[in-house]
Amino acid sequence: MRFMVTNLRHVGLVVNDLDKLILFYNKLGFKVVDRKKEEGSYIEKLVKIKAVKLEWVKMKLKDNSILELLKYHSPSAKFEKKVQESNRISWSHISLTSNSIVDTIKKINQFGGNADKEYLFSPDGNVKVIYCHDPEGNILEIVEEL
């Protein structure tokens, strides 16, 4: 059998305020499908952190895309609320497709995120698009296909 990656399983995002981010992403259409606290040798070996205690929540969209939110209780992750720059070395953004960019922008702002009201049209005219931020400053790209 030939080696092959078959799909993107999920995107994991370390967060400071788990419940706030669950509410935010729920308002964008994600539904909680699983939530668990973990500690012990298995999770220590997996994440390579001694005496780790964490909690994770898996949230799913209708198309089965999964977002995993992780809260490290011990040792806690350093949190510095700042808007992430799109050109930093690391992951850049989470791109979400919406059927109404205007309504999605309203929800993002209503539930603690930050989005300008003005979106762009792609040069080919096929999509409306905007970069914005969740309540902890992570970059979201919202795309509406035309």
Placement of each model-derived feature along the sequence:
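N-terminal beta-strand motif that seeds the catalytic metal site of vicinal oxygen chelate
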Residues: M1-I22, K31-D34, W91-L96, L146
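Vicinal oxygen chelate
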Residues: R2-F3, R35-K37, E55-K60, L67, ...
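Exposed loop/turn and edge beta-strand positions of beta-sandwich/beta-sheet ligand-binding modules
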Residues: N7, V52-K53, S90, N126
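Core segments of cupin and vicinal oxygen chelate
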Residues: V14-N64, Q110
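A short, acidic/glycine-rich surface segment
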Residues: G40-K45, S76-K82
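Active-site/binding-pocket entry motifs
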Residues: S65, P75-S76
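Non-DNA-binding regulatory cores of transcription-related proteins
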Residues: Q84-R88
